């Protein structure tokens, strides 16, 4: 989920994304990435990057998929970053230790804290996200949709089917 570090959810603009829309956006991202590659491997930033990385890997025909596990969110608040798991030695070797020829995928770049940390680890990798906010956008090489910094994206894996009251009734 996207977040501003100090704002509460009531001050953000909701942006619900359906599975169909997310899949279309990931395929559109892949069309752009196909012009930039080839890539030796995909690295998903977990957890948000797992679903888009799977779609991108399928569409690009990539079989080497790795993860970098970075924790920055607790519920709806952004906190300190921790690398819980780095990329494997085999994947790092494919990228010559700097990430050259590797594709890093995440669902969203928000403030850029996670992106900056991953960029420091793999400075030559190509960094792609489905969605980008203005603060983090400069860190991303390829993205599909820009949203405002005060937008809160509700990804399909974070939501369930439920009644939505009409906007006229004060629904956000």
UniProtKB/Swiss-Prot annotation:
Xanthine binds at residues 110, 153. It is found in: Cell inner membrane. Guanine binds at residues 110, 153. One of its GO terms (molecular function) is magnesium ion binding. Its main location: membrane. GO terms for biological process: GMP salvage; purine ribonucleoside salvage; XMP salvage. Keywords: Cell inner membrane, Cell membrane, Glycosyltransferase, Magnesium, Membrane, Metal-binding, Purine salvage, Transferase. Mg(2+) binds at residue 107. GMP binds at residues 110-114, 152-153. It is a peripheral membrane protein. Pathway: Purine metabolism; GMP biosynthesis via salvage pathway; GMP from guanine: step 1/1; Purine metabolism; XMP biosynthesis via salvage pathway; XMP from xanthine: step 1/1. Its cofactor is Mg(2+). InterPro entries: PRibTrfase_dom, PRTase-like, Xanthine_Guanine_PRibTrfase. Belongs to the purine/pyrimidine phosphoribosyltransferase family. XGPT subfamily. Homotetramer. This is Xanthine-guanine phosphoribosyltransferase.
């Amino acid at each position: 989920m996207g977040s501003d570090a100090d704002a509460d959810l009531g001050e953000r603009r909701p942006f619900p994304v359906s599975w169909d829309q997310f899949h279309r956006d990931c395929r559109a991202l892949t069309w752009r990435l196909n012009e930039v590659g080839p890539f030796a491997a995909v690295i998903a930033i977990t957890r948000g990057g797992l679903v888009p990385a799977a779609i991108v890997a399928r569409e690009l025909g990539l079989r080497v998929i790795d993860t970098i596990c970075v924790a920055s969110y607790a519920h709806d608040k952004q906190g300190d970053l921790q690398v819980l798991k780095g990329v494997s030695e085999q994947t790092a070797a494919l990228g010559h230790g700097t990430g050259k020829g590797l594709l890093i995928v995440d669902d969203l770049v928000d403030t850029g804290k996670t992106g900056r940390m991953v960029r420091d680890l793999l400075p030559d990798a190509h960094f792609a996200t489905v969605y980008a906010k203005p603060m983090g956008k400069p860190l991303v090489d390829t993205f599909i949709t820009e949203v405002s910094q005060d937008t809160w994206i509700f990804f399909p894996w974070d939501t369930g089917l439920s009644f939505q009251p009409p906007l006229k009734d004060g629904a956000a």
